[in-house]
Amino acid sequence: MANFTAADVKRLRELTGAGMLACKNALAESDGDFDKAVEALRIKGAKDVGKRAERATAEGLVAAKDGALIELNCETDFVAKNAEFQKLADDIVAAAVASKAADVDALKAASIGGQTVEEAIGALSAKIGEKLELRRVAIFGGTVETYLHRRAADLPPAVGVLVEYTGAGAEAAHAVALQIAALKARYLSREDVPEDLVASERRIAEETAKEEGKPEQALPKIVEGRLNGFFKDAVLLEQPSVSDSKKSVKALLDDAGVTVTQFVRFEVGQA
């Protein structure tokens, strides 16, 4: 008996963009395990798998101040453009700086205007008639470069980046912040990539090469090449620099005498 339902098949289709039969077969092969089903679909070449899985349906904005970054969600872009909603976001990120709240729960308990952040969110939610959610917060304590990006001129920022660094190269740090916003690096260095993710990518590369009919003796070289491609996509220091494609981000930073210690990227509606 199958360990999944028609609703599970529908959900996997929404996550991956693959066809109904492909999703049904992937769930059957994985005994209902969604992660394994997604991996199986990637091996078989389903388009946009993984990318759609990270998506969430949300509107809202990101706001930053003095090394703090928050994401505040609403249901429609109409509310995202609302002045009161934007002011609330500014007040919340200021509260994050003042309270040094390291997570959402701590920030919700922080004070703004004689009430908690959670109470302020609830009050505005009741007033405008939409569900509002403080989704995440990040605070860095060192020297920080901040970049906010708008998807359209009439919308508030939807992408926010914080880059903590050492060294005097503010221009290089800004270039890296733009890089992170555009190319969506997930990890600072290769060593930061979880071992289980590396193992999964290696397995996917090998199985994909086999599906393509590549000769057995060529598999190790092909797998390593594709794994290196994954690292160049996901790891900041290994990405080609957008400001100088002949150099990696690491080379750009080395030339400027800058060391990135950590970074974070928030995008509204993304995991």
Curated annotation (Swiss-Prot):
It comes from the Bacteria. CDD domains: UBA_EF-Ts. One of its GO terms (cellular component) is cytoplasm. InterPro entries: EF-Ts_dimer_sf, Transl_elong_EFTs/EF1B, Transl_elong_EFTs/EF1B_dimer, Transl_elong_Ts_CS, UBA-like_sf. Residues 76-79 are annotated as: Involved in Mg(2+) ion dislocation from EF-Tu. Associates with the EF-Tu.GDP complex and induces the exchange of GDP to GTP. It remains bound to the aminoacyl-tRNA.EF-Tu.GTP complex up to the GTP hydrolysis stage on the ribosome. GO terms for molecular function: translation elongation factor activity. It is found in: Cytoplasm. Pfam families: EF_TS. Transmembrane segments: none annotated. Keywords: Cytoplasm, Elongation factor, Protein biosynthesis. This is Elongation factor Ts.
